[in-house]
């Protein structure tokens, strides 16, 4: 069989007892192990586009002498072509069905992921978010909610890597955050607990960057804690940008780390939290948008309602001809 596959031609061994010694010894060895007697052999490769996808292997003709003749070789050679095409077409059809089924399953995962993201509230709500996946599923997530007494919680995260593995870790991290953030009002303690859980279960080499916070509209304060996430931008009422750079390592790397939180005065300003898909998106020449480019879009639409503002910013970024290869996620918190 191997010789037929390598040479890509039909081979007949008329009588193994009279043919070349190595072939005879090969079949005699098999016969001794199986109690079968080999008299004659036909092997024809199945060729599609000059590639061997298999071999038809025939033993012993159903005649008295059990020996294949040259006409048998020619017949098998003729039949092998259509057989190869039929087998290849069947395989392609199965692959297409499997691919369509997997694509449908991925789309379902994508739809489930969308339900994990907070929905924007259009009337006087200080927080809005947007997520545009690079593919059907995303490795980014955000969440925000009203905690009561003028307080609002929010979180943005980016899972390392891309694809299904990243989206599954994202789903776990977002579910943990949604559950724990309802009862924990310390940003640092919440990160500590999330980190412990992710360290126990995340696949080796995977991690999550995350920034979480609480906005107190009565005290006009921001409580922030950062686990290796992109430094957020604060756009103040006087038109200047302030950077919050304090951060610990990403979640899932160091199980014993203790995260710190910072309290900032926050009045008549906007906090922009985003993933690196925003600042690292490139134009046709390979130039990244970077922080300065993002700031220009913020300035352009700052006086637009927050949910419209984010849509316009992302729309402009994509319309500028930049090529999206990563998820785009932004959350804005507007201070009163």
Can you describe what each PLM-predicted range is?
Residues 1-17, 244-247:
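Acidic/proline- and glycine-rich, intrinsically disordered low-complexity segments
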Residues 14-40, 61-62:
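Signal-transducing coupling segments at domain and membrane junctions
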Residues 39-48, 54:
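A short, aliphatic-rich beta-strand micro-motif
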Residues 48, 66-88, 171-175, 267:
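Amphipathic alpha-helical "output/dimerization" segments
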Residues 55-66, 159, 336:
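Short beta-strand-to-loop transition segments that serve as allosteric relay/switch motifs
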Residues 69, 164-184, 242-245, 268-321:
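Active-site-proximal, acidic helix/loop segment immediately C-terminal to a metal-coordinating Asp/Glu
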Residues 71, 85-104:
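Short alpha-helical interdomain "coupling" segment at the junction between an upstream regulatory sensor module
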Residues 97-272, 322-336:
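… and, occasionally, acidic/histidine-rich disordered N-termini of signaling adaptors
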């Amino acid at each position: 069989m191997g010789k037929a596959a390598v040479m890509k031609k039909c081979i007949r061994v008329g009588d193994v007892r009279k043919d070349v010694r190595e072939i005879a010894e090969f079949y005699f060895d098999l016969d001794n192990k199986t109690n079968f007697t080999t008299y004659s052999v036909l092997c024809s490769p199945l060729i599609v586009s000059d590639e061997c996808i298999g071999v038809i292997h025939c033993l012993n003709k159903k005649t008295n002498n059990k020996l294949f003749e040259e006409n048998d070789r020619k017949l098998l050679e003729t039949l092998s072509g259509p057989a190869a095409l039929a087998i290849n077409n069947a395989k392609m059809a199965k692959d297409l069905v499997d691919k369509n089924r997997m694509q449908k399953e991925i789309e379902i995962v994508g739809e489930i992921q969308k339900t994990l993201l907070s929905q924007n509230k259009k009337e006087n709500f200080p927080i809005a978010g947007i997520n545009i996946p690079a593919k059907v599923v995303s490795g980014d997530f955000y969440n925000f909610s009203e905690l009561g007494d003028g307080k609002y919680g929010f979180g943005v995260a980016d899972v390392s890597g891309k694809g299904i593995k990243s989206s599954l870790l994202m789903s776990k991290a977002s579910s943990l955050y949604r559950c724990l953030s309802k009862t924990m009002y310390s940003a640092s303690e919440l990160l500590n607990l999330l980190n412990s859980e992710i360290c126990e279960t995340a696949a080796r080499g995977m991690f999550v960057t995350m920034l979480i916070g609480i906005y107190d509209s009565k005290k006009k304060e921001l409580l922030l804690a950062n686990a290796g996430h992109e430094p957020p931008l604060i756009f103040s009422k006087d038109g200047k940008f302030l950077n919050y750079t304090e951060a610990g390592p990403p979640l899932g790397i160091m199980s014993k780390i203790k995260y710190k939180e910072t309290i900032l005065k926050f009045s008549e300003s906007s906090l922009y939290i985003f993933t690196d898909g925003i600042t690292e998106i490139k134009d046709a020449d390979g130039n990244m948008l970077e922080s300065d480019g993002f700031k220009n879009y913020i300035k352009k639409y700052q006086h637009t309602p927050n949910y419209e503002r984010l849509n316009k910013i992302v729309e402009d970024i994509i319309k500028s001809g930049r090529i999206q290869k990563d998820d785009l996620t932004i959350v804005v918190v507007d201070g009163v």
